[in-house]
Amino acid sequence: MIIIDGGWAENAPALRKVIAQNGNHVDAWFISHTHSDHVGAFNVIYADPQGVTIDRIYDNGYDYEFIKEAGEPYDSMGLEPLETFHNLTKDADNIIHLRRDEELEVCGLRIHVYNAFDDIVKQNVGPDLDYQNDGSLCMKITNQEESFLYTGDVKADMNKYLFETYGDELTGDYVQLSHHGNWGFGTEDYDRMNAKAYFADITPEFYESHPIGELHQHLVDEGKQYYDYGTAPNSVELK
């Protein structure tokens, strides 16, 4: 069983049920970045496992001291869960800090890391100094024939570097929209990817007030398969 992020702290009970259905064992748990909507449930479960075992934890190689000093535009969404995650895992012997361009194999799947927290993020961050989102994991997960591009919460600050550096590698048969479909990769980027389906980790109620509304309509108009929390539970088989 592989988990990527896991949601808010209040999502922990539901996530525990899913883990229990898989023998209370997690082979690999990826934390894209330490904002509360991504790491909250992990923090709760790791602090009180209740029988849950985790073989490996992979994070984005965040710089704890740097982020604490630089600050966080999302206040309690960023610094408090960062502090909790750091204190929980700093002495763990099963945590791996991923780096840009790293390649690994997990549960028979090939994973290529295109974005992680490093000096390149620091050089490209925008005026909001949103280091945690911009330093979020972006990685392609590939099985025998198909791939899934997970983009985390990477925002538009990183678009120029990522697409100039990796170009057509940044695609997949299935694609998760970056930063919940808001202020991340552009419409033209998703068109170029031409994925079979797009996943948005957001509820439809945000479509009228956030940029995701326009992106959602565009993808639907283009005839793309589109999933969000409103269509959950969502699943695909990665061949």
Residue ranges and their predicted role:
Residues V18, A28, H38, Y58, ...:
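Broad hydrophobic/π-residue packing in well-ordered secondary structure
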Residues M1-N24, K90, N94-T171, V236-K239:
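Core dinuclear metal-dependent hydrolase active-site scaffold
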Residues I2, G7-D59, T165-N182, N194-Y198:
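Active-site metal-binding motif and surrounding structural segment of the metallo-beta-lactamase
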Residues N11-L15, H38-A41, M77-F85, Y150, ...:
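Stable alpha-helical elements in mature extracytoplasmic
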Residues L15-R16, F42-V44, G71, L162-E164, ...:
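Short amphipathic alpha-helical segments
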